[in-house]
Amino acid sequence: MKLDILAIGVHPDDVELGCGGLLLVEKSNQKKVGIVDLTHGELGTRGTAKTRNEEAAEAAKILALDTRENLGFADGFFKNDEEHQRNVISIIRKYQPEIVICNA
């Protein structure tokens, strides 16, 4: 599936907090939109990984996302190395987005 916009966040809820409004507007403009979370947010202080994944699924419904995936990287422990880069590259190739949004 080709996406117009792919937003990548480190933790579930990063994308929603950073650009959820933009994604909602673009969905109303008939754009195909997806989110990829790199981790399950297991080190976060705002709930367990299970809770955050449940909330991410609910947010996907509210935002009417075309897809949402989680790459399952270890929160706080993944590196900017070839292995992790290849995972992200494969997602970008899979969805061939026109626009990629990511947080720093």
Short names for language-model regions:
Residues 1-95:
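Active-site rim/loop-helix segments in enzyme catalytic domains that contact anionic ligands
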Residues 98-104:
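Acidic beta-strand-to-loop metal/phosphate-binding motif
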